[in-house]
Amino acid sequence: MIPDVSQALSWLEAHPDALNGIGRGIERETLRVRPDGYLATTAHPTSLGAALTHKWITTDFAEALLEFITPVDRDIDRLLAFLRDIHRHTARELGEERMWPMSMPCRVERDGDIELAQYGSSNIGQMKTLYRQGLKNRYGALMQVISGVHYNFSLPLSFWQAWAGVNDAESGKEAISAGYLRLIRNYYRFGWVIPYLFGASPAICSSFLQGKESKLPFEHGDNGMLSLPYATSLRLSDLGYTNKSQSSLGIAFNNLPDYISGLKAAIKTPSEEFAAMGVKDKNGDWLQLNTNVLQIENELYAPIRPKRVTRSGEAPSDALQRGGIEYIEVRSLDINPFSPIGVDADQVRFLDLFLIWCALADAPDMDSAELACTRKNWNRVILEGRKPGQTIGIGCGKTERPLVDVGKALFRDLLRVAKTLDSQGGECQYQEVCERLAASFDDPDLTYSARFLRTLQDNGIEKTGMALAEQYRAQLREEPLQVLTEQRFHDEAQRSRQSQSEIEESDTLSLEAFLQGKS
């Protein structure tokens, strides 16, 4: 049903200090909205600094889509306090605008109302906007303003030294990369537990469909709300950001050279569909960066990514080739609407436990057929995860087991990991999280999606969203900073603006020549 990890867990219990120093970082996206709930049409506030170069506050797809980024931290409370400080400062700088507190956008009239993020006049700034122009023309802008939380996670070198026998990060990079790919394969097989527990997009505003038909059997509620009774995360469904043309790429996670070559091939693979669109329109305005399946590597849709911090101008795959996998990025978390900062400590601790389990459990190689099979399990959980009697396919559909049984078996293992982690700090926080979340398998009404759906059914999406946005705005604006200071925010905003100016002044090539050099 799940891999037998008893030996690995016994090893972990004998080496508890191997987990000292887990690295964590969080990226949280949120839309700026006006007091009437519509998407803000204002520019990114200059008081927040330059989105191109700011270390903590930037934008994602749209000018109104804020993205907050924490540095790597080894302390969960400090990590979340840092993220909350970014929210506190931003709430004070946004005037009357609010931060939308859920993943799915609501009051957007048309795709054309969504302004692409702007990054100034430098070649790299214009390239970032052109890439977004390509995303808009390929998939539609509305899909791109769905918000999520990304969790960055790295195991300490001490873990790899004890577990894989490496001496240091450089000489051991192949073993470390293989270890992270093992984690990723297990994540594809069992990561559906994340939307089961934490999915928080069981409903959408009907305006999100923009008049298009959907194959999903939505229930029509008041105020134009569409929902599925047992859904967990419509954000992760085909309504959200998935790329049909990518399904044939066959990017594998069995070893790093194959993963890198698959990624590099994807940005060179031509697409008939995108070629028909053209690179420029008849007026000579850019429509997309190129006509390949992926314009750049970041366009690859994935619920989890192997990562390494890139050097200036370096592609993600080149960074991986240079130094191996440094950390992984989990991309399956919906915005947590119950938290002013979109994520909470229970979620962070659960992800620690689950990702450690994924690193320890055996993970046979995965071919493209099995990768497609894992997607079926995810889809079941995304659309009908709380359905009574729901099953999960084990071993590419060879057997079906009740989701509840698989979840409980997993949590029995996670409790052992929790005890090991707690033994280091003399606390019970990980075990308490385990016990709280394990109850969601006996009672699906405890899941985030069930709790949130009840609220949405009572009050509708718009009313709920605006009430939470106003509540969190008032709360955050009043709270003092914990980790950062207003002076540090001021200095970083100033530094980012100066840095953008320097980049703009140092350009020597035309945009055309610059893009030619990138292809």
UniProtKB/Swiss-Prot annotation:
Annotated SUPFAM superfamilies: Glutamine synthetase/guanido kinase (SSF55931)
BP terms from Gene Ontology: glutathione biosynthetic process
Its EC number(s): 6.3.2.2
UniProt cross-references to InterPro entries, sorted A to Z: Gln_synth/guanido_kin_cat_dom, Glu_cys_ligase, Glut_cys_ligase
Keyword Nucleus: no
Signal peptide extent: none
Annotated family: Belongs to the glutamate--cysteine ligase type 1 family. Type 1 subfamily.
Stated name of the protein: Glutamate--cysteine ligase
